[in-house]
């Protein structure tokens, strides 16, 4: 069997943060793009919220290609949610955030996955509407790990990537780079190119990389990754979880 860097992006860390830092937040609204990944995240969020005794007052799906969210947002607003959780891609969530402002929808917490991981989303909605929106990703260039391998630190990886390609790396590109680093480390550890020896070296690996801690479970999936939760504060991405790389605290209040 193979080795995989894929690890489900779950909603437990955001839910834990809200339950701990904002226990007064009880009413959750979920609006999900009707597509495999965004809908899976939304369903996990629903489970995670209910597990903590939160009241999911609204759960709706929107079709791929939706441009007008007015009806869904109006219905959501009527439920007076304290935490709005939306899933989709960059264009979806730029439009949604702007239309939330048009309807003067505000809440203590607004989480959007996965668009705020991209600078394009922050630029698209502007600093004012991005303020205090939270998100999560498998990895983000704002994280800070001091790792082994050819790149060493996250900062160095991001610097080298920007010098080569002229853009910020996202989690897809970083995971590809991490896979190369991990394979190199496994070959060095095995002292061989023999497939079985390299695989055994991978299976027993426990290292820190620019991507984060790397350790694999019996099923071949990475089980050490703590996907960062972050918040846009004053136009910048601030990591608020995990504690080992936390750069700031959760700020409440997302307005118009």
Segments the model singles out, each with a brief description of its role:
Residues 1-256:
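Extracytosolic ligand-binding ectodomains
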């Amino acid at each position: 069997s193979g080795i995989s860097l894929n690890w489900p992006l779950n909603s437990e860390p955001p839910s834990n943060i809200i339950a701990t830092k904002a226990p007064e937040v009880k009413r959750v609204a979920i609006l999900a793009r009707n597509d495999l990944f965004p809908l899976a995240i939304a369903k996990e969020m629903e489970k995670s919220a209910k597990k903590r005794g939160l009241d999911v007052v609204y759960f709706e799906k929107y079709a791929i290609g939706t441009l007008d969210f007015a009806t869904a947002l109006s219905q959501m607003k009527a439920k007076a949610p304290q935490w709005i959780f939306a899933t989709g891609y960059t264009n979806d969530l730029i439009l949604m955030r702007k239309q939330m402002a048009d309807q003067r929808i505000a809440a203590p917490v607004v989480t959007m996955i996965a668009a705020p991981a991209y600078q394009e989303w922050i630029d698209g909605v502007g600093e004012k509407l991005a303020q205090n929106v939270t998100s999560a990703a498998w990895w983000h260039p704002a994280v800070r790990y001091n790792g082994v391998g050819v790149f060493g630190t996250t900062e160095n990886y991001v610097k080298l990537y920007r010098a080569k390609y002229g853009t910020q790396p996202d989690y897809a590109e970083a995971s590809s780079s991490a896979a190369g680093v991990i394979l190199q480390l496994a070959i060095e550890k095995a002292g061989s190119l023999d497939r079985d020896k390299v695989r055994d070296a991978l299976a027993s690996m426990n290292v820190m990389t620019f991507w984060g801690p790397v350790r694999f479970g019996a099923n071949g999936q990475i089980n050490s990754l703590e996907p960062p939760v972050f918040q846009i504060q004053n136009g910048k991405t601030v990591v608020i979880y995990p504690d080992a790389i936390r750069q700031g605290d959760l700020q409440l209040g997302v307005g118009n």
